Amino acid sequence: MKINKNFFVENIKTFLYALIIAVIIRSLIIQPFYIPSSSMEPTLLVGDRLFVSKFSYGYSRHSFPFSVNLFKERIIFNQPQRGDVVVFKVPINIESNTRTFGVDYIKRIVGLPGDIIEMKNGKLMVNNNEVIRKKIRTDQKFLPNGKILDMEVYLEILKDGRSYETYNIRDDGPADNFNKITVPKNSYFVLGDNRDNSKDSRFVGPIPEVNLVGKAQVIFFSTKGSTILEFWKWPFELQYKRIFSLIK
């Protein structure tokens, strides 16, 4: 009986140690995320699973499970750069100050604190300068209703030379024009790469730095809809070329 009790205790200890290590890794080093929507296409596709580094921008309450309020501001902070793809807690009810965060979003930073951001007919303006974009191809997207949607693909080039692809359907959509906004201190302006299908800073406003969760780094697994556990579907749905792709 004593042996069985010791065996039970040792197994509980092993489980607790493993749980503590997992929480530390998830909170301080790296965390997996799943892409459920098309808002970051063509960079990130539905079904992509990626690793987000938690240390890239330092740490805040949102680095930890359930956003436990260990500290109010970020610590060991490193400023994000334009072009970074980031995961953040979407800000909600900021004016009422009742709850300042919601679900996890993933978007691209296009505006730093103090930047002047504007959109004119689908063209991004940063500090009164139009961001260079070059049309490189047209992709076809097959919709559930059987229709085919032509997606113009642009290469957007930032001032520092960083570039990435964006989708564009039209230049007169609901969010293709908005007046100048100066990004507040300690905040960032983010956009989805799928410009006509993204709920981003054009709708939820600038993102406070404390809401940043981490920087998207690499795609470690990708399917066309099946889960990791549905391994029997992998031969038909696994997107091999995307696995271990760096996120730029």
Per-range role (PLM):
Residues 2-9, 24, 28, 33, ...:
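Soluble "head" domains of membrane/secretory-pathway proteins
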